Amino acid sequence: MSTNKSSIEKITLGSFLIALGVVYGDIGTSPLYVMKSIINGNGGLESITPDFILGVLSLIFWTMTLLTTIKYVLITLKADNKGEGGIFSLYTLIRRRAKWLIIPAMVGGSALLADGMLTPAVTVTSSIEGLKILPSFNDIFGNNQDIIIIIVLVILSFLFFIQHFGTEIIGKIFGPVMFIWFAFLAILGIVNLSGNLYLLKALSPHYAIKILFSPNNHLGFFILGGVFLSTTGAEALYSDLGHVGRKNIYLTWPLVKICLLLNYFGQAAWILSQKNNAKLYGIESLNPFFQMMPSWLLLFGVLISTLAAIIASQALISGSYTLVSEAIKLNLFPRLQCLYPSNSKGQIYMPAINRILWIACIAIVLYFRSSDNMEAAYGLSITVTMLMTSILLFNYLLKRKTPLPIALIILVFFSSLEFSFLISSAVKFEKGGFVSVLIALCILSIMYIWIKGHYIKMSLLDYIPIENYKNQLKELKNDVDRPKYATNLVYLTSSEKSKRIERKIMYSILDKRPKRADVYWFVNVIVTDEPYTSEYTVNTFGTDYMVKVQLKLGFRVNQKLNVFLRQIVCELINNGDIKVQNKKYTTLHNRNVGDFRFILINECLSSESKLESWNSIIIRSKLFIKKFTVSPAKWFGLESSEIEVENVPLILGSTRM
């Protein structure tokens, strides 16, 4: 683990390009739609004044400075969990401070996943709509939005299709492409800004405050909803910390910010130069980003912006896989199949999530049809995530012994700022924002059902001391009249106590059909707060035939149980804790480990269960969701092992622990 961390912290040309390709896709494509959204929302080009433009630029500059630079880059990036970032990594650092902290973690994670469904749709659509300005495109298709939609659907479908094969090869071009993209943004901005340097006055916060109360601002306070789009990628920047390291973000962010600001200022200069151009007044959804390009550069501009949009979408898709994977390991989300299409660290693929994201993105494009309509829905959910991150960050600062007044100032300042953006974005609800809210609520409901169902079951399950059955297990082990069921018989237990297991496990061994084995294993898997922990403790109860294993794995470690267990068995044999398990017939010389059989207990709710109506609904809902999840055999990597599934009635409410 230390090697991985040190390698990503190195500052090289390669790490510089990787950071550009991985971290800044979302925030880097914001110039495609931020100014467009604000200008069209204020009544179009004809309603623009110099004071309005200065105010907008000032709002964008200070939003990026306060939220992205100060909150995320300078403060939040320091809240890393062994080099890993993101809202769930932050939660694992502080979850022992208070149980209620799971609420902002779940709410923030749900909203971030909802944002991941909107981002690919809005960025790709915004870039492809640039084709409408091309004379050759207009001559053939005119102002036909259906053609734009078809192209967007093809690109998105292709992007989701290739996830199955991994993106390691094409991922190598992400960095160079984003380098060209940011250079393009800067050059385009400088060319249009030259001669309009008075716009640099917008760096003063005076203009940001003034525009909120100016009669030239037809949106009033709600202009912040459009301005916020310039910083939506800040949360993704924190989530990708583990891929590139803090030092690489410190190095690249100032350069990225300068490129973005130069482009925003260039767009502003073009807007002021064209505000009296009546020919542009009738253009629907005027986009300054494409309009300020010379005609000979338009095709390249559309191509490079589309590539940047695809890279931004890829980053959000990969981020969604990672986010769901972490939620699963923290028992906040149902277990779904995880595949590893490449050898790169952190490269995972989740087929179910990929299908859901693809269907959601396609549905969003078909429902909203244009980037204008999508922008109306975009940004609302991410403000919620930022607010939740601020709450978790406050608790992290207190844990790190930050003086309470300083921690409170940070919490109040950034929460007030983010709450202002949330209120200003709330106007988007009826214009399409309800879509992201509904998506977030669906995800949150699944999380709530899953974790609440777990707590209900854990509080009512019947646990028993293993030592009470030591003699019976010894007699069963030595009962030669019974055929040997397995050399090593393995059960998974949820009990974290070293001397207790669920009664249903002992019932399976002794009552259902007595199972004779040389060694009985009771394995409890605990997910730790650190990302890459891999350690275990054992309790043999003074025997060589009963072992309770507590396997501690980091929240980013694959839970391949057979691999870990075989290693543990070998170590216990070498230490003399259990006997050598010689096999009479084997193709391997000197093999001293016998066969394994895993018993997986499948629970179904019994009609005898006595639960309150709400708890009963939760448990039944969880069991229903469980039908669509990956089997324990696949989750724990036991597909090639000998397993047996036993159905056991889940009787809850009659016995308390």
UniProtKB/Swiss-Prot annotation:
It is a multi-pass membrane protein. Belongs to the HAK/KUP transporter (TC 2.A.72) family. It comes from the Bacteria. It catalyses: K(+)(in) + H(+)(in) = K(+)(out) + H(+)(out). Its main location: membrane. Keywords: Cell membrane, Ion transport, Membrane, Potassium, Potassium transport, Symport, Transmembrane, Transmembrane helix, Transport. Transport of potassium into the cell. Likely operates as a K(+):H(+) symporter. GO terms for cellular component: plasma membrane. The chain crosses the membrane at residues 15-35, 48-68, 100-120, 147-167, 173-193, 219-239, 251-271, 292-312, 348-368, 378-398, 403-423, 431-451. It comes from Clostridium perfringens (strain SM101 / Type A). One of its GO terms (molecular function) is symporter activity. The gene is kup. This is Probable potassium transport system protein Kup. InterPro entries: K+_transporter (IPR003855), K_trans_C (IPR053952), K_trans_N (IPR053951), Kup (IPR023051). It is found in: Cell membrane. It holds the Pfam family K_trans_C. PANTHER family: K+ POTASSIUM TRANSPORTER, OSMOTIC STRESS POTASSIUM TRANSPORTER.
